[in-house]
Amino acid sequence: PFTTSVADSMIIGLHIEDNVYGPLYFDYLADLDPDDPIMAPRNLFETWINQFAPETVLVLVKASPDAIRNRMAERPHKAGVVQRGDIELVLRRFEEEFQRSALPNKLVIDTTDATVEESVAEFTRRIGPFLTDRDRDRMDSIDADSG
Protein backbone atom coordinates (compact mmCIF):
# COMPACT_ATOMS: atom_id res chain seq x y z
CA PRO A 1 0.00 0.00 0.00
CA PHE A 2 2.91 2.41 0.46
CA THR A 3 3.78 2.50 -3.22
CA THR A 4 3.25 5.01 -5.96
CA SER A 5 -0.07 5.12 -7.74
CA VAL A 6 1.53 3.36 -10.71
CA ALA A 7 2.49 0.15 -8.92
CA ASP A 8 0.39 -2.73 -7.72
CA SER A 9 1.09 -4.48 -4.44
CA MET A 10 0.24 -7.74 -2.77
CA ILE A 11 1.02 -8.03 0.91
CA ILE A 12 0.61 -11.39 2.60
CA GLY A 13 0.25 -11.64 6.35
CA LEU A 14 1.48 -8.26 7.62
CA HIS A 15 -0.02 -7.26 10.97
CA ILE A 16 -2.85 -9.79 10.97
CA GLU A 17 -0.47 -12.73 10.70
CA ASP A 18 1.61 -11.18 13.49
CA ASN A 19 -1.48 -10.90 15.69
CA VAL A 20 -2.40 -14.55 15.10
CA TYR A 21 0.96 -16.32 15.07
CA GLY A 22 2.92 -14.00 17.42
CA PRO A 23 1.28 -15.00 20.69
CA LEU A 24 0.80 -18.61 19.66
CA TYR A 25 4.23 -19.54 18.32
CA PHE A 26 6.72 -16.73 18.83
CA ASP A 27 6.08 -15.61 22.43
CA TYR A 28 5.19 -12.02 21.67
CA LEU A 29 1.93 -10.11 21.88
CA ALA A 30 0.71 -12.86 24.23
CA ASP A 31 -2.02 -11.83 26.65
CA LEU A 32 -2.39 -8.42 25.03
CA ASP A 33 -5.81 -7.03 24.30
CA PRO A 34 -6.15 -5.67 20.73
CA ASP A 35 -6.64 -2.21 22.26
CA ASP A 36 -3.58 -2.40 24.53
CA PRO A 37 -1.33 0.67 23.97
CA ILE A 38 1.56 -1.52 22.83
CA MET A 39 -0.64 -2.62 19.92
CA ALA A 40 -1.08 0.96 18.67
CA PRO A 41 1.72 0.78 16.05
CA ARG A 42 0.30 -2.47 14.68
CA ASN A 43 -3.18 -1.01 14.61
CA LEU A 44 -1.82 1.98 12.67
CA PHE A 45 -1.14 -0.25 9.67
CA GLU A 46 -4.81 -0.17 8.76
CA THR A 47 -5.02 3.59 9.29
CA TRP A 48 -2.11 4.01 6.88
CA ILE A 49 -3.56 1.58 4.38
CA ASN A 50 -6.94 3.34 4.47
CA GLN A 51 -5.23 6.71 4.08
CA PHE A 52 -2.69 5.91 1.37
CA ALA A 53 -4.22 2.92 -0.42
CA PRO A 54 -7.98 2.98 0.20
CA GLU A 55 -8.55 0.60 -2.71
CA THR A 56 -6.76 -2.20 -0.80
CA VAL A 57 -8.77 -5.40 -0.52
CA LEU A 58 -8.38 -7.66 2.51
CA VAL A 59 -8.76 -11.27 1.41
CA LEU A 60 -9.35 -14.06 3.91
CA VAL A 61 -8.34 -17.37 2.34
CA LYS A 62 -9.65 -20.23 4.42
CA ALA A 63 -10.52 -23.92 4.38
CA SER A 64 -12.17 -26.38 6.74
CA PRO A 65 -10.03 -27.88 9.52
CA ASP A 66 -10.19 -31.30 7.83
CA ALA A 67 -9.07 -29.88 4.49
CA ILE A 68 -6.13 -28.16 6.18
CA ARG A 69 -5.16 -31.33 8.06
CA ASN A 70 -5.26 -33.31 4.81
CA ARG A 71 -3.16 -30.70 2.98
CA MET A 72 -0.63 -30.64 5.81
CA ALA A 73 -0.31 -34.43 5.60
CA GLU A 74 -0.13 -34.55 1.79
CA ARG A 75 2.19 -31.59 1.27
CA PRO A 76 4.01 -30.73 4.50
CA HIS A 77 5.99 -27.49 4.64
CA LYS A 78 9.57 -27.75 5.87
CA ALA A 79 9.18 -24.59 7.92
CA GLY A 80 5.47 -24.91 8.64
CA VAL A 81 4.23 -22.83 11.54
CA VAL A 82 0.74 -24.14 12.28
CA GLN A 83 0.57 -27.26 14.43
CA ARG A 84 -2.17 -29.84 13.79
CA GLY A 85 -3.71 -29.32 17.21
CA ASP A 86 -3.98 -25.56 16.64
CA ILE A 87 -5.84 -25.57 13.32
CA GLU A 88 -9.25 -24.65 14.74
CA LEU A 89 -7.74 -21.93 16.93
CA VAL A 90 -5.76 -20.45 14.04
CA LEU A 91 -8.84 -20.46 11.79
CA ARG A 92 -10.88 -18.75 14.50
CA ARG A 93 -8.18 -16.14 15.15
CA PHE A 94 -7.83 -15.26 11.45
CA GLU A 95 -11.63 -14.92 11.23
CA GLU A 96 -11.65 -12.66 14.30
CA GLU A 97 -8.89 -10.45 12.89
CA PHE A 98 -10.66 -10.30 9.54
CA GLN A 99 -13.95 -9.25 11.17
CA ARG A 100 -12.16 -6.75 13.43
CA SER A 101 -10.26 -5.15 10.55
CA ALA A 102 -11.02 -1.52 9.71
CA LEU A 103 -10.29 -2.15 6.04
CA PRO A 104 -13.62 -1.68 4.27
CA ASN A 105 -12.98 -3.82 1.19
CA LYS A 106 -13.16 -7.47 2.21
CA LEU A 107 -13.42 -10.75 0.38
CA VAL A 108 -13.52 -14.36 1.66
CA ILE A 109 -12.31 -17.26 -0.48
CA ASP A 110 -13.08 -20.72 0.91
CA THR A 111 -10.71 -23.24 -0.66
CA THR A 112 -12.05 -26.30 1.17
CA ASP A 113 -13.23 -28.13 -1.94
CA ALA A 114 -11.31 -26.19 -4.58
CA THR A 115 -8.05 -26.67 -6.42
CA VAL A 116 -5.54 -23.85 -6.56
CA GLU A 117 -6.70 -23.07 -10.09
CA GLU A 118 -10.35 -22.99 -9.02
CA SER A 119 -9.51 -20.73 -6.08
CA VAL A 120 -7.61 -18.31 -8.33
CA ALA A 121 -10.54 -18.32 -10.77
CA GLU A 122 -12.95 -17.55 -7.92
CA PHE A 123 -10.73 -14.70 -6.76
CA THR A 124 -10.56 -13.35 -10.31
CA ARG A 125 -14.36 -13.41 -10.59
CA ARG A 126 -15.01 -11.87 -7.19
CA ILE A 127 -12.37 -9.13 -7.15
CA GLY A 128 -14.19 -7.26 -9.93
CA PRO A 129 -16.37 -5.01 -7.73
CA PHE A 130 -13.26 -3.80 -5.90
CA LEU A 131 -11.31 -2.81 -9.01
CA THR A 132 -10.94 0.88 -9.72
CA ASP A 133 -11.62 2.46 -13.10
CA ARG A 134 -7.86 2.82 -13.47
CA ASP A 135 -7.44 -0.92 -12.81
CA ARG A 136 -10.02 -1.74 -15.47
CA ASP A 137 -8.42 0.64 -18.00
CA ARG A 138 -5.03 -0.96 -17.42
CA MET A 139 -6.49 -4.45 -17.82
CA ASP A 140 -8.20 -3.40 -21.06
CA SER A 141 -4.88 -2.01 -22.30
CA ILE A 142 -3.09 -5.27 -21.50
CA ASP A 143 -5.82 -7.27 -23.26
CA ALA A 144 -5.58 -5.01 -26.31
CA ASP A 145 -1.78 -5.37 -26.43
CA SER A 146 -1.91 -9.16 -26.18
CA GLY A 147 -4.73 -9.61 -28.67
Language model regions located:
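Short alpha-helical segments and helix-capping/turn motifs at coil-helix boundaries
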Residues: 1, 43-45
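Conserved substrate/cofactor phosphate-moiety recognition/catalytic segment
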Residues: 1-10, 16-24
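Conserved catalytic network of the ASCE P-loop NTPase/AAA+ motor domain
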Residues: 2-5, 50-54, 101
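Alpha-helix initiation/capping motif
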Residues: 13-14, 83
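Conserved nucleotide-binding/hydrolysis micro-motifs of P-loop NTPases
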Residues: 15-17, 63-69, 113-115
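NTP-dependent small-molecule kinase module
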Residues: 74-78, 85-147
